[in-house]
Swiss-Prot record:
Lineage: Bacteria, Pseudomonadati, Pseudomonadota, Betaproteobacteria, Burkholderiales
Protein name, as recorded: Small ribosomal subunit protein bS20
Region (Disordered): 1-25
Name of the coding gene: rpsT
Ribosomal protein is among the record's keywords: yes
Biological role stated in the UniProt entry: Binds directly to 16S ribosomal RNA.
Record-stated family: Belongs to the bacterial ribosomal protein bS20 family.
Transmembrane spans: none
GO biological process: translation
This protein's GO CC annotations: cytosol; small ribosomal subunit
Gene3D superfamilies: Ribosomal protein S20
Pfam family, one: Ribosomal_S20p
InterPro entries xrefs: Ribosomal_bS20, Ribosomal_bS20_sf
Length: 92
């Protein structure tokens, strides 16, 4: 248990930051799942539209250092490749 005033304040701040960061990490995962769901449905236009919105969300969360920028880029790249592959498989 924190005894000094500054230790109590740091504990409060850490709890608040943890709660906020957890919500943003959840938003990150939800954005990825939304695109994956559209890709699995096979609707390229809808998947591309959702990817645009999710891409912004992913970038914002990476800018806040909730996830590393390389992790965000990796997820965006894989989602974009999956959408592009969806177009190729639909054409064949």
């Amino acid at each position: 248990m924190a005894n000094s005033a500054q230790a109590r304040k740091r504990a409060r701040q850490a709890a608040k930051a943890n709660s906020h960061n957890s919500a943003l990490r959840s938003k990150f995962r939800t954005a990825i799942k939304a695109v994956r769901k559209a890709i699995d449905a096979g609707d390229k236009a809808k998947a591309a539209e959702i990817f645009q919105a999710s891409s912004k969300t992913i970038d914002i969360i990476a800018d806040k250092n909730i996830v590393h920028k390389n992790k965000a880029a990796r997820h965006k790249s894989r989602l974009a490749a999956a959408i592009k592959g969806l177009q190729a498989s639909a054409a064949q």
